[in-house]
From Swiss-Prot:
Listed name of the protein: Acetaldehyde dehydrogenase
GO biological process: catabolic process
EC number(s) given by UniProt: 1.2.1.10
Higher taxonomy: Bacteria, Bacillati, Chloroflexota, Chloroflexia, Chloroflexales
Annotated binding of NAD(+), by residue: S13, G14, N15, I16, S159, A160, G161, P162, G163, T164, R165, Q166, N167, N278
Record field: catalytic activity: acetaldehyde + NAD(+) + CoA = acetyl-CoA + NADH + H(+)
Any one GO molecular-function label of the UniProt entry: acetaldehyde dehydrogenase (acetylating) activity
Provenance organism: Chloroflexus aurantiacus (strain ATCC 29366 / DSM 635 / J-10-fl)
Annotated Pfam families: AcetDehyd-dimer (PF09290), Semialdhyde_dh (PF01118)
Amino acid sequence: MQIDKVKVAILGSGNIGTDLMYKLLKQPGRMELALVAGIDPASEGLARARQIGIPTATDGIESILADPDIRIVFDATSAKAHVRHARLLRDHGRIAIDLTPAARGPYVVPPVNLGEHLEAHNVNLITCGGQATIPLVYAVSRVTAVRYAEMVSTVASRSAGPGTRQNIDEFTFTTARGLEAIGGAREAKAIIILNPAHPPILMRNTIYVVPEGDFDEETVRQSVAQMVADVQQYVPGYRLKSLPVIEQRSTPWGERPVIIMLLEVEGAGDFLPTYAGNLDIMTAAARRVGELFAAHLLSKLEVTV
């Protein structure tokens, strides 16, 4: 028998979990969505899953643990909840792809280090701001050392649900750590702003990068352009508003050239409105990571009898 699909489940039926459900249905790859689990029987996400014939559960993680065929679990709950979920999933031999800022496993950003942690039991997708800005900081750091990176992420207030609002502190800490650990900056800072404007704005990010020393401007611009193209393979609405700008500025390390990048992320509109690019980039990254984990599992598990 040829095994060609890996069963996966989504834990959390809010905005992120529901958008991820539609992405997995649209581009399943080597994955089969076997269950969507939440805790609110009246949630729109569970109702939509039932309407399209996907099994659902309202007892949270319990139904996932009870099905031994589910190998990969996308956790779209909250950082606090994932602390408990991570332990249970590991104890039951499941792979956790964590869409919360809990950071119980190594950080993963698809175009940067997607293949480095395929034996991990738990990987963390950092934050929406991290998925958006870490690739650009890494694009600089791979061609010249980076002393400092700072990102300011502005998202539509309407795109920030209760889970996002509860995780603000975790967002800033985890994003900054990701800019350092994955982006390659020696030091970093992250800031998020919820903009109540109507109509809602697209996700916008401003990234400041202070290189350690001299660098070739054209090499940096080419590296950034290649990274944008790499991210666009799974987030088509990911785009720079202009070419990177390089300005001489006063910094804590003296007069230095500062690389400034203005980034916009438009969502695909699978479930969430297109202005919610901050959520869309998380679910798109999750699907991308899940796809590689599924392929890796199948490469080890496929048998012919």
